[in-house]
Regions:
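Rossmann-like adenosine-cofactor binding region
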Residues: 268-369, 374
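Short, glycine-/Ser/Thr-/acidic-enriched flexible segments
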Residues: 70-72, 83-89, 104, 140, ...
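N-terminal ligand-binding/catalytic initiation module
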Residues: 1-208, 440-448
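General beta-strand structural signal in soluble alpha/beta enzymes
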Residues: 164-168, 191-196, 239, 262-265, ...
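Glycine-rich phosphate/diphosphate-binding loop of Rossmann-like nucleotide-binding domains
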Residues: 197-200, 205-317
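Adenosine-phosphate binding glycine-rich loop
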Residues: 2-29, 224, 337-448
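Buried hydrophobic packing segments
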Residues: 108-111, 181, 217-225, 249, ...
């Protein structure tokens, strides 16, 4: 980065921090993008004059609302709901809803900002948004989750719609929660439309939607590996998380010939040197999706596995790492451990799971590193395909959706290579994804 570009980033970030104090996740996400785009922006008088990045970094609308609901003891509880409608230059706002105690405005603004670029990369007509609440569904009965979802949607419904804003699931929001919210939306609005994605197959959902983020991350990693004449076959893979993304990344990596040896949750991780095969993965899916248990129970059931409480799996020797849990879960020291252990490829299944220090280390050592906005775009791409099917009142077969998903991930990889290839031949996927995602949104904003 030259002096002019560096000065642009510092001035831009100083203004952003002044306007958005105490929002570290948002600052981190914007800085990463600004550093990638700065040389491009300072070379373009139009982008500077029209202040395109400054406009993208300011949400079009932020909605914050009260969510009162009745728990099983008959007591009133109050949570806070949010919807950040970031950018609608290329389509209706699109992005997930997250239910987790850590949810705050900074996290949702960072996610909505990232979502804008990710949705642009898919080439589908979707803007960027994100929402959620500090409600914690863990340990709650189905009845309590239903009451909360209904109260949440009672307010949210006035701000969304199939041509305005189309939410989906995220951490803490799966098929059960989407069902409760869709039912409430339908009761209040008296219409059956594709206003939410991630719906059940029998009522407007798309085949492969649950699998899409994990599968797409593997398809992207496969394309990256191919640039070095490598593949998943015979490789050892470390995956963090044990939710939707981690489960299907594990399944697809195994199908592609790799051996997945770790999964984790907020309490710790399991290491199974024999590999997590289809039968073991089925147990994990039952444990997590139905019984909502802890990953520790995997080690109790399979003697080949060992459980490490309070730790993350990045010290385990592997060829490919796929962080699929949550933001900033992989720091500089852990990145160095992966490098020292011979890891060649890191593909982010979660949103911004690697800290800036970790990314720097991966890039210094010329690892194949894919940021979440490119690698995990398969989820929102398939949400876009669900919106298309809802609009046309048809359902495609799983094979058709998989082929379209695969094609989208290959295209995203091509865009990253086009914009991210450095003079020495190294592909900087962070720069490639940021410039590729930015250009489409910027051109649309300039035209409007």
């Amino acid at each position: 980065m030259n002096e002019q570009a560096h000065q642009y980033v510092e001035d831009f970030m100083a203004q952003l921090i002044l306007r958005n104090p105490n929002e570290p996740e948002f600052h981190q996400a914007v800085r990463e993008v600004a550093e990638s785009l700065a040389p491009h922006i300072v070379a373009s008088p139009v982008l500077q004059k029209m202040k395109v990045l400054e406009r993208i970094a300011e949400p079009e609308r932020v909605i914050i609302f009260r969510v009162p609901w009745l728990n099983d003891k008959g007591e009133i509880e109050i949570n806070r709901g949010y919807r950040v409608q970031m950018n609608s230059a290329i389509g209706p706002y699109k992005g997930g809803i997250r239910f987790h105690p850590s949810v705050n405005l900074s996290i949702l603004k960072f996610l909505a900002f990232e979502q804008t670029f990710k949705n642009s990369l898919t080439t589908l007509p979707m803007g960027g948004g994100k929402g959620g609440s500090d409600f914690n569904p863990k340990g709650r009965s189905d009845n309590e989750v239903m009451k909360f979802c209904q109260s949440f949607m009672t307010e949210l419904q006035r701000h969304i719609g199939q041509d305005t804003d189309v939410p989906a699931g995220d951490i803490g929001v799966g098929g059960r929660e989407i069902g409760f919210m869709f039912g409430q939306y339908k009761r209040l609005r008296d219409e059956f439309t594709g206003t939410l994605t991630g719906k059940g197959r029998d009522w407007g959902g798309s085949p492969l939607r649950p699998e899409a983020t994990g599968y797409g991350t593997c398809y992207f990693a496969q394309e990256m590996l191919a640039t070095r004449k490598e593949s998943f076959k015979g490789k050892t893979v470390c995956i963090s998380g044990s939710g939707n993304v981690a489960q299907y990344a594990c399944q697809k990596a195994t199908q592609l010939g790799a051996k997945v040896v770790t999964l984790s949750d907020s309490s710790g991780y399991i290491h199974d040197p024999e590999g997590i095969d289809e039968a073991k993965l089925e147990y994990v899916m039952e444990l997590k999706n139905i019984f909502r248990g802890r990953i520790k129970e995997y080690a109790d059931r399979y003697p080949s596995a060992k459980y490490y409480p309070g730790e993350r799996p990045w010290g385990v020797k592997c060829d490919i790492a796929m962080p699929c849990a949550t933001q900033n879960e992989l720091n500089g020291d852990q990145a160095q451990a992966l490098v020292d252990n011979g890891c060649i490829c890191v593909a982010e299944g979660a949103n911004m799971p690697s800290t800036p220090d970790a990314i720097r280390i991966f890039q210094q050592h010329k690892l194949l590193f894919a940021p979440g906005k490119a690698a995990n775009a398969g989820g929102v791409a398939t949400s876009g395909l669900e919106m298309t099917q809802n609009s046309m009142r048809i359902t495609w077969s799983p094979e058709e959706v998989d082929a379209k998903l695969r094609s989208i991930m290959v295209n995203i990889h091509s865009v990253c290579v086009q914009y991210g290839t450095q003079p020495d031949g190294y592909i900087n996927y962070v720069v490639g994804a940021n410039i590729g995602g930015f250009m489409k949104v910027a051109n649309a904003m300039l035209a409007q």
